[in-house]
């Protein structure tokens, strides 16, 4: 009799644990969904302000695919990218590898085999994707930093990262120039510059005017 009771209690404990795990998983999935949707909303608003309507509408849609969403939910923390947590556990992020090959606003997308060196090297990003990258980085800082966000947050993140060694030198120079403008002159002037100058193909200050 006591054996049956103990067995029932153990089974009850297992059911309770399973229920709690399922509840936690569902909650993380919901929180992850809200986070990536909030991020998309900020990017979309920024893109719309500079005239990149299609890019704003389609930004990061692959994050809702099973390959990215379920891994993102599993490693969701709320204060940083789930890709970082997945990378810490496994040594790499499957979600990120899926994502970077489908989204042109990431500089990692822009790599190809160089004929001279026979090595994969970075390629300078087209300007419309450079601008979307600016919106992406700004939005990520807004979402993850919350009240601690400042116009200089994206530049600070860039300066702390190893990206400077991986990004095409000209793309890095352009990105840093824009992020410094965002920090020093604010959104209104920076967005106007992106719309009226960068996306119009006008030269950056260090470039020569086309003859």
Locations of the language-model features?
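Metal-dependent phosphohydrolase cores
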Residues: 6-211
């Amino acid at each position: 009799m006591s054996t049956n009771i103990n067995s029932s209690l153990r089974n009850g404990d297992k059911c309770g644990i399973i229920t709690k795990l399922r509840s936690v998983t569902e909650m993380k999935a919901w929180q992850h969904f809200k986070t990536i949707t909030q991020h998309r909303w900020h990017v979309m608003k920024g893109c719309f302000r500079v005239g990149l309507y299609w890019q704003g509408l389609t930004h990061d849609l692959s994050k809702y695919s099973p390959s990215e969403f379920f891994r993102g939910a599993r490693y969701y923390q709320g204060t940083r990218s789930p890709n970082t947590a997945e990378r810490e556990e496994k040594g790499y992020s499957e979600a990120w590898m899926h994502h970077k090959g489908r989204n042109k606003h990431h500089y990692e997308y822009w790599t190809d085999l160089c004929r001279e060196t026979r090595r994969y090297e970075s390629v300078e990003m087209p300007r419309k994707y450079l601008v979307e990258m600016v919106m992406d980085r700004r939005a990520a800082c807004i979402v993850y930093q919350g009240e601690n966000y400042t116009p200089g947050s994206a530049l600070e993140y860039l300066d702390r990262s190893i990206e400077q060694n991986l990004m095409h030198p000209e793309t890095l120079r352009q990105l840093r120039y824009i992020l410094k403008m965002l920090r020093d002159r604010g959104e209104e002037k920076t967005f106007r510059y992106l719309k009226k100058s960068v996306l119009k193909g006008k030269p950056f200050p260090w470039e020569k005017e086309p003859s």
